[in-house]
């Protein structure tokens, strides 16, 4: 395990000032090309890609941003803290296709939000209400309907201590034929551990549920996957993709030519510092989740103090959407690079 090394940046300030001044003379303005954007002290709660835009929430208000960080739409009266965009068959989308977003909030509601292709509000409806807080909804299109999950927490939320009493986290699965009426289907997993940052992929008749499992908030955590071959009726035992040697925060897991690629933000090089010591890593697996390589540090720009929301390919480029200094400044950043360049 590598030891986290702190860099004294005091000597960098004068040099950076000289560089900015030189750039101002050359280009007529100050600043350095960021290959994306930076929104300082944005303090958003969640963020996801929605096509070639971004959906995020600030003070539980939902906003749509373009890839330059400009707000192009917002929705009065809607409150969201956790969001999930259903993006099946994105490449074949047309102007008549609508976006469907699952979101949940501190009113113990899980909603389905429907937007037009250009982000006009069509309908917002409550899908499920719970007795206690429910986080991390997921929406999946099936052949004959939809599946929806949320993670309900009974007891202590985000227990901060290894000696504390953790709440029970239960990942509930619901089904619907019309996106309006939802029926309980099963509970995928229930643990007296934090179950967070879930995502589902549906491929060739199999559902894959990816998630983080940790004993206490910001402590060491596993990344796991469970599978279902009967439309979500029953699920396998968890397969551990990354062990709990660091605070691993899952962002996305996508199919590749050889199997799977998992993106996480992790304090692997600075264990114990959680978000403030985290960087983006990618991990490759065969189709059966046998590891090929793990904890490969991404060459993404500004890869320090990262809480990664999502990594996504758009028009041949890798796009990384993340918070910097999540627990303090909570800046929102987008960084882009050519596909393949994120590898060391």
Annotate each language-model stretch with its function.
Residues 21-35:
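Bacterial Sec-dependent signal peptides at the C-terminal "C-region" and cleavage site
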Residues 8, 24-27, 254:
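Compositionally biased non-globular segments, especially hydrophobic aliphatic-rich helices
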Residues 31-344:
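Carbohydrate-active catalytic/glycan-binding domains of CAZyme proteins
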Residues 3-5, 28, 334:
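A detector of low-complexity, intrinsically disordered, Ser/Thr/Gly/Pro/Ala-rich segments
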Residues 19-22, 106:
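Conserved structural scaffold segments of CAZyme catalytic domains across common CAZy folds
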